[in-house]
Amino acid sequence: MSTTPATPKVGFVSLGCPKALVDSERILTQLRMEGYEVVPTYEDADVVVVNTCGFIDSAKAESLEVIGEAIKENGKVIVTGCMGVEEGSIRDVHPSVLSVTGPQQYEQVVNAVHEVVPPRQDHNPLIDLVPPQGVKLTPRHYAYLKISEGCNHSCSFCIIPSMRGKLVSRPVGEVLSEAERLVKAGVKEILVISQDTSAYGVDVKYKTDFWNGRPVKTRMLELCEALSSLGAWVRLHYVYPYPNVDDVIPLMAAGKILPYLDIPFQHASPKVLKSMKRPAFEDRTLARIKNWREQCPELVIRSTFIVGFPGETEEDFQYLLDWLTEAQLDRVGCFQYSPVEGAPANDLGLDEVPDDVKQERWDRFMAHQQAISAARLQQRIGKEIEVLIDEVEEQGSVGRSFFDAPEIDGSVFIDGDHGFKPGDKVRCRIVDADEYDMWAEPI
């Protein structure tokens, strides 16, 4: 008497940034298409895949900790992702891992899974169809759209190019077709991500591709114009401050894409920016920000900064605080500089900033920016906004406005039971705000 073979089961842990999350989605989509079941616990899995982060040393430590936990709880572990480029470091700590690959090695990861637990030979892909948009790890109403891999910059604090390589842009027709599938599947917000969104198409000389029979240039402006036709919110992340950023501001002013720019300025002191190998035109940047806001008064600018970079003096730090006062950024994150193995900054020969000074500067930075963010949100009280509902709880609903990217920005809280569902878009009036969040009432 024949018995039906057991369905092979895979556990999956995804660490790091949204780019890594998209890599995880792609691997999981392929495994699901081959009949694998994705399970939420180590003990139920036949094998566990850990997609690691290797951006900074604390992320590497977390990756090694999670790998160790998976080995302890399951025993069969496959490692991939950015830290995977350091196979020796991983095997030194965890010699029993079955396979180690770097980022974007989708086929190698799937093959490694095959070796541990082969797919069922009798699997019929028509019985358990994977949706056209693939497996998504985000809530159903928003999704990350990765438009390129790698980066052509050589920022001295960063090792991303050594892990993910030089810029490789995806064909714009392929990107737009994916976005179209996402919207048809119910996605209300598309978050455009890459290592360097404004450089999209540079590597292919902005060549023309085709989407639904019409020509589209492989360039940020044309991509945004096409995405705006799909009827979803379009939010731009990781936008390097090239001159071509100016070109998309009119689209924001016209309401075609969200008036939101995520631009990692990193610092303002010309001396520190030079050491970081970042653009050192902070005065010109202030003029551009002013111009952007004149064209699009609703524009929200998010950024990230590093304090305590080698050689940063108190004068440099005060320059940064003064620049923040001038720039009046809306959403800001800040990190204390952490040396990364293999980063060029380690070889600059600059004085290290003591840890207690880094902490003190971080505290001052956050207090300074919180006051700016709070004042800017106070100006929103009484105004009407559209809110995308993320969660519905007993006390009310939690959503986001065009001000807020998921996970990294604030929320909009709506008290009471209004029958909303995740993914609903609701017209509201803002009634209160603090440094990060807003409270609103439906209109």
Swiss-Prot record:
Residues annotated for [4Fe-4S] cluster 2 binding in this entry: 151, 155, 158
Q: Name one GO cellular component term.
A: cytosol
Residue ranges of the TRAM domain?
378-443
Q: Which reaction does it catalyse?
A: L-aspartate(89)-[ribosomal protein uS12]-hydrogen + (sulfur carrier)-SH + AH2 + 2 S-adenosyl-L-methionine = 3-methylsulfanyl-L-aspartate(89)-[ribosomal protein uS12]-hydrogen + (sulfur carrier)-H + 5'-deoxyadenosine + L-methionine + A + S-adenosyl-L-homocysteine + 2 H(+)
Q: Which InterPro entries match?
A: Elp3/MiaA/NifB-like_rSAM (IPR006638), Methylthiotransferase (IPR005839), Methylthiotransferase_CS (IPR020612), Methylthiotransferase_N (IPR013848), Methylthiotransferase_N_sf (IPR038135), NA-bd_OB-fold (IPR012340), Ribosomal_uS12_MeSTrfase_RimO (IPR005840), rSAM (IPR007197)
Question: Origin, by domain of life?
Answer: Bacteria
In terms of one coarse class, where is the protein primarily found? cytoplasm
UniProt remark on cofactor binding: Binds 2 [4Fe-4S] clusters. One cluster is coordinated with 3 cysteines and an exchangeable S-adenosyl-L-methionine.
* Subcellular location(s) of the protein: Cytoplasm
Keywords, sorted A to Z: 4Fe-4S, Cytoplasm, Iron, Iron-sulfur, Metal-binding, S-adenosyl-L-methionine, Transferase
Cofactor(s) needed: [4Fe-4S] cluster
Q: What is its EC number?
A: 2.8.4.4
Name the family.
Answer: Belongs to the methylthiotransferase family. RimO subfamily.
Q: What does this protein do?
A: Catalyzes the methylthiolation of an aspartic acid residue of ribosomal protein uS12.
Which protein, by its recorded name, is this?
Answer: Ribosomal protein uS12 methylthiotransferase RimO
Gene this chain is encoded by: rimO
